[in-house]
């Protein structure tokens, strides 16, 4: 007996299949031609967390010491910033300023807890450098009501549970205290679940800014403690000398911990060999922004024949030559560009973030090896970070 296959169908199925193109065309023609104005939640969240610009306003100013002020910043709704972007303890914002003809940026670490940003307040500390360019301007001009343009929060000096130990050892001085003050505040209010042991280096006790607040936080929470290390005087409840491997081991009993470092270049130079002696895995060692080198000619590999020389830099942007600007061998190309009023995207000013990434088409630059964070391909194709590149000859630079 032959096998029989029975197919149950109808002519309507075939007819409908044939009619699909005409039905589709009719639906398209009947649809409204106005664009869909969809506001997807994921895009709204991304724009809130990572805005290209935050328009802020100074809410109040607090004198911290003879040369340090705290600025409490809030969102400037009149210019489009309704809420402040959230951040992680240890991150910074980059502030853009117009000072005379120059357009400059400076990163300032947020010293408040992220919880405070939910109440629309950032707090930054600005220490005045009498020989500086930006900090005196801020001290002299920023008052309640001053409008400020800033970036979203950036930076990698924050606790990441997939990478870091819950036991954090912080090494700092008055130039890097904001990162750890933010962490201590976050530990206190429950935003950050870590243990922080902070070694605070200073010449004298009265130079350790924010000491009273740090002591308050340490007294109220056993997950945070601070050890003051004074180099130039003896004081009660303070260590004398510098931060060393022996001193760290005296106060840290944990077998596994992360070391976070943030502060001045001299601090980095002193503690780096001490950290090496701790024999920690590299992932447990984190450095904050190193900042610009104030005396690059003092570096051992800086070309001595270039000291004191001035060169010309031809600047090109979007195919247009903006002109030739003078640049000293002992200042970064970014500083030279800003001084001439040429706006360049920059955030960290430490050779890390890559926002100022530019192409060097001719000439030579000096880049300190310890802070050269460029990709290998960038190094091969003449890509440099002007914020940490020093001219060694006349050159041509294409900026973004």
Q: What residues fall within each predicted segment?
A:
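FNR/FR-type flavoprotein reductase catalytic core
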Residues: 1-15, 136-308, 312-317, 322
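C-terminal accessory/binding modules appended to enzymatic or scaffolding proteins
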Residues: 308-345
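Ferredoxin-reductase
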Residues: 40-147, 202-204, 215, 231-233
